[in-house]
Amino acid sequence: GATVVAGGLPAKARNSGAKIASSSVLLFLDADVVLPVDFLEQTFYEMQARALDITSCFITPRSKLRLDKFLHHFANYYMRMTQKFHPHIPGSCIFVKSTLHKTISGFDESLFMAEDHDYLKRAKKMGKFGYLKSYKIPVSVRRLSEEGRIKIALKYIAVELHLLFIGEIRKNIFEYKFGRHFKS
């Protein structure tokens, strides 16, 4: 049984869900994620076996286009290479112990973008992080298709440069749209 909670930007929606959750592990998923059949069982087992407090999977596109595969492979490589000094976590799939979520006061709702990376940065200071090896999470390429692959790649590069040299993103300075496809 699922409960629908008030949404908003991702940080607010995730925090709203976490407030009513009763599990010892929270799982935050994007609305368009389609999980493989035994995904939850295998990933939860791996999280426990490796004693991870916060984790995620690398990503794979739900697309057969070579460019999509390359872009997602590059994103995974970048996440792997920067995890020690500038950690990233795909917001499409985040597992976290509920105690850790509470300890770091959840997601920062004042951030417009990259709230997931900020969340991981704070969580890593208090708990053990690692990427899961058992699965890559299949993610939608809808945004790539709609906005254009080069345009969105350049936008993500601009976001990264902003995070590295200026800081958190608290306004929609990159014309990034959320939740357009799931309005009722």
Describe the predicted segments one by one.
Residues 5-21:
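Glycine-rich, basic loop-to-helix element that forms the pyrophosphate-binding segment
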Residues 22-23, 90-104:
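Conserved nucleotide-sugar donor-binding
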Residues 26:
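Short aromatic/hydrophobic "clamp" motif used to bind/position activated sugar donors
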Residues 30-34:
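The conserved acidic donor/metal-binding loop of glycosyltransferases
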Residues 37-67:
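Conserved donor NDP-sugar-binding/catalytic core segment of glycosyltransferases
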Residues 56-91:
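Short, flexible, basic/aromatic active-site loop/helix in glycosyltransferases
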Residues 113-119:
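Acidic donor-binding loop at a coil-to-helix junction in glycosyltransferase catalytic cores
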Residues 125-184:
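Hydrophobic helical membrane-anchoring modules
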